[in-house]
Structures are given as structure tokens and as C-alpha cells.
Amino acid sequence: MTSNIFKKVLARRLAVQALYQWQLNEQPIDKIIEEFKSSELYTNIDAEYFAYLLTNIDAKFEELKKTIENASDLSWNRIQPVEKGVILIGVLELQSGILDHHITINECVELSKHFGSEDGY
């Protein structure tokens, strides 16, 4: 049995993949969510949290992007899509206050290690 905490970890991982697809294919987020529901990995995640992350990042994208641009020395266009996904998840979680900031930061570091490039941000 998968713990609720691990289900959220897996939801974030799948969300990074979905955000990567969203950035490259520019599909509506609800279509991407539907596509990911057929993934074998989807059965092990916190599906509600996965949908929460994606729909809120989509709805608040310009606000989140502006926050990231204001806090970074890099322009948005220089950040790789995988790293953008991780950062978007982190900023959304930090702004929403749904998790302790220590948890969010740790989870984003782990996502970066898992998905990011060796020289990731």
C-alpha cells in the first residue's frame, strides 16, 4: 500500500512530466490530465493533488511566471522546460501555503535531482 505522502511525491513527479508536455505541445491542461489518467503510474498517485497542481499552474501561469522572473537572474526563456515545471510547482506550493515551506523546498530539490540536468537550477 502506498502512503499518502508518497502518493503526493509521485503526483509531483507526474506533474513535472505533464508540465513538460504542456510547455512543448501547448495542449489544454485538461486534455493533458485526461491523457495522464491512462498512465500506469497514475493509479499510484494522489490524483486530486496532481489535478490541483496542473489546473492552478495553468490558471495562475502569468502570475507564477512573473514571480519567478522577478526572483531570478535568468530570463524565463533561458530556463529549461523540466526546470520550469519544478519551479512552477514550488512557487505554487509556496504561494498557496498548503505545505510547510521546508517540505516544498526539499521536494523541489528532489524533483530537480530526479528530472533536471546536471547543471540544473
Labelled PLM ranges:
Residues 1-121:
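N-terminal interaction/assembly modules
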